[in-house]
Design a protein with these regions (language model features):
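Short, small/acidic-rich helices and loops at N termini and domain boundaries
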Residues: 1-60
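Glycine-biased, small-residue-rich flexible motifs in mid-sequence functional cores and linkers
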Residues: 42, 56-338
Length: 338
């Protein structure tokens, strides 16, 4: 595209002209000769019917921040409102899917307070830290953005379907994959470069050693972005990856100000750091979406299509309903129930 100036000129180039450029291998030339735009036009029609926006590097609203990364996406499909990322303090929040309740609460509260201070939150829409980060931003009445590893309408992780709907109405769902494109173990690591590429910095809340969230960190480092980490107990395996990042030079944080002070002089019109220096505290209860995640069977993965099941208490007796409500997602002593 850089050689031809734009995508249109690339697509209209004849096979002979393309061969003379020396840009493509023999295999790529064979694919180019057999290429048609019929599938592309079909995707455009489908996006129009679904109400998705299509953004390419030729568009003025394609983030310059994203265009500067190695291998930027050639296209973004968007459901919702796509902001001017270059004029916003966008912060990525990542972490393990099988996180602790403490990790969920920290992610939720940190995202809420970052949003209240003027930042926008970007994550991956997955279970665990991702979902809690999105929920925190939504609770603050702000915008949040989920970068998916599949087509926007693909039935991925149905347990988070309602959360994705809320995100599309208060932010946007973003993907480089066209409608109906399935999720796989390959698509998620690839999309992580977009999560970090849209943002000024990436926050790791909880990460075991080998966590997929560390792939996002690798991309962020390659892109020259900041890395922030919530420190954890040195004996806690859920923080093994996190603490290793701190050892290697990442910024340990305990308040939203630890993050936002890095950008306040560049975005004073966006940020309000009043109260941001207070430590992260949490006392709010998990949402129903988060409770649903907790009771999800272990065999369900992000690629599964298990329908969301909510507990109906209307058929229970008053005593049974009271007993049910006394239980918690964490351990409960029998003496606390009676």
């Amino acid at each position: 595209v850089h050689h031809f100036g734009n995508v249109k000129a690339f697509c209209e180039c004849s096979p002979d002209q393309m061969r003379k450029t020396g840009l493509l291998s023999r295999t790529e030339l064979n694919r180019f000769e057999n290429m048609t735009l019929d599938e592309c036009y079909g995707i455009i029609d489908q996006c129009e019917n679904l109400g998705y926006n299509i953004i390419t590097p030729n568009d003025s609203n394609y983030p310059k921040r994203l265009a500067q990364i190695p291998n930027p996406p050639a296209v973004l499909y968007v459901k919702g409102e796509f902001p001017d990322f270059d004029d916003n303090v966008a912060i990525a929040m990542v972490g393990t899917r099988k996180c602790s309740e403490n990790g969920r609460a920290i992610a939720r509260e940190l995202a809420r307070r970052l949003t209240e201070a003027g930042a926008i939150i970007v994550s991956g829409g997955a279970k665990g830290i991702d979902a809690s980060s999105h929920v925190g931003a939504l609770r603050a009445g702000g915008k949040t953005f989920a970068v998916l590893g599949c087509g926007i309408n693909y039935p991925y992780l149905q347990i988070n379907a309602e959360l994705r709907r809320d995100i599309s109405e208060n932010g946007a769902l973003i993907s480089e994959y066209p409608p109906n494109f399935p999720s796989s173990k390959f698509t998620f690591p690839i999309r992580n470069r977009i999560i970090s590429g849209l943002c000024l910095g990436t926050v790791v809340v909880e990460a075991v050693q080998g966590s997929g969230s560390l792939i996002t960190v690798d991309h962020a480092l390659e892109q020259g972005r900041d890395i922030f980490v919530i420190p954890g107990e040195i004996s806690d395996p859920l923080y093994e990856g996190s603490n290793r990042l701190i050892r290697d030079g990442a910024i340990a944080i305990t308040t939203p100000a630890d993050i936002l002070c890095e950008y306040n002089c560049y975005y004073p019109h966006r940020l309000n750091l009043e109260g941001a220096e207070l430590p992260i505290a949490f006392s709010d209860a998990p949402t129903q979406d988060e409770l649903d995640e907790i009771i999800t069977p272990e065999f369900e993965t992000e690629f599964g299509h298990t329908p969301k099941i909510r507990t109906d208490l209307s058929s229970l007796s008053a005593d049974a309903r009271l007993l049910y409500e006394r239980f918690s997602v964490s351990k409960v002593d029998a003496f606390d129930i009676v």
